[in-house]
From Swiss-Prot:
Pathway: Secondary metabolite biosynthesis; terpenoid biosynthesis. It comes from the Eukaryota. It comes from Cannabis sativa (Hemp). This is Myrcene synthase TPS5FN. Mg(2+) 2 binds at D323, D327. Expressed in glandular trichomes two to four weeks after flowering onset. Mg(2+) 1 binds at D323, D327. A motif (DDXXD motif) lies at residues 323-327.
Amino acid sequence: MSLSGLISTTTFKEQPAIVRRSGNYKPPLWDAHFIQSLQVIYTEESYGKRINELKEDVRRILEKEAENPLVKLEQINDLSRLGISYHFEDQIKAILNLTYNNNNALWKKDNLYATALHFKLLRQYGFNPVSSEIFNAFKDEKKEFKESLSKDVKGMVCLYEASFYSFRGEPILDEARDFTTKHLKQYLMMTRQGQNVDHDDDNDLMVKLVEHALELPVHWRMKRLEARWFIDMYAEMSHHHHMNSTFLQLAKLDFNVVQSTYQEDLKHVVRWWKTTSLGERLPFARDRIVEIFLWSVGLKFEPQFRYCRKMLTKIGQLVTTMDDIFDVYGTLDELSLFQHALGRWDINTIDQLPDYMKIFFLATYNVVNEMAYDVLKQNGILIIKYLKKTWTDLCKCYMLEANWYHSGYTPSLEEYIKNGWISIAEPLILVNLYCLITNPIKEDDIDCLLQYPTFIRISGIIARLVDDLGTSSDELKRGDNPKSIQCYMKENGICDEKNGREHIRNLISETWKEMNEARVGESPFSQAFIETAIDFVRTAMMIYQKEQDGVGTNIDHYTKDGIISLFFTSIPI
């Protein structure tokens, strides 16, 4: 048969076009050339000597005895909010130990501010037990908080902040939160209406503090951004209340010098991201290397963790890209092939993958192996199998969500959360972080960590729910899986999304109580590492502030402001 005859008698099946979704993500805000052009001014070499002198001055201040323990507590609180308490952990613990073990509490008797500040600091620094029953002293014969307390705005703010360190089964702190929230809102309303007589600079500062607290409590805020805000507030206070000028000088210099290390590290990760070509080759995915670096600073802001931040940023951007592959771009068959290849962790298996997956797999493979090699050099332990497990666990959860989407299945809220606290990638990030900051690494400890203990599960749940509040509206518009809000609504026959969102907010608040318990509970892991799990949540609450998506569709709002203040704007000295 002639070739022309073969062509004329053969029916060719046209391959159906693959329909792929789009996340409609905005391009990156930050130009790589701008990042590389940043001028580093406040270097350790130039300002290290002055910082060390100021640190010695602060140590002397902390070690100087005070007649009233409240003075020392205020110093600790100021150092914490200024972002420099990490230099003085030993001195702070020594002071708090004295107040914790001292039964003579006349200095705080009938003083709401002193009582609340002491309680807050003890819980903040992990002392246990610290009974919330001390606040019964501020109730009346009806067992309700005395209305007269509302006149003590400073004490009310402190009680409000303290209430966010509550455990389960502490109704008095729930009552305290409701009571203070109500009266602080009334205080703001009356001040705006000119009904507060004392309208002066002090009152203006108090209004700012109250507004800031009601927007989000300090316990829920990203530490470094909170420090940046409070440094400006402290400078304003110093003109009226004779705040400690040494504290302020150190806070400003410390912030600027640490910011310089962030600038250098940001240049590094931006160069790395450019060399991967993933931003160009996978244009459907979020190109958010600067925003992810902000997240790494939220987890470990101290200057000694530079390598940790750089590696976490690389890992975080890869996780974000993989999330978009599964959520937006990949077909079910492609995703299944990718899951198999990742499970094998063998570059010889990637020939069967589509091109966009090949380059992504190799980029991930190289970063994970680079990290494992560095840890092997430093610690003498091979961690590939541990890192691989975190990636395969995450991929398994992504795959389940993809199957839900393609089958049109809506899980129950419990089923959704059971998968979602892992798919938020918090377990992967924390296991990697543990390997980056721990020396020596003990196999028993990392085996335990890979069982994802309670503090990892709880922080993952909160982060997932916070993420859902910020992203569900945009994701549903493009046809994504139902989020926790919609799962709850369908399960309970609720039509009004406001009710669904309110339930998730309440669930977040209740789960925070479990997180507070985990901070002081028995664990083979250090309190500092457990605190990092909480910092993951704090950073999530900043990224998705006011229930907006600061990594996906709303990058030019709160996240942008945070990046500018932390990385690009130094504090005038």
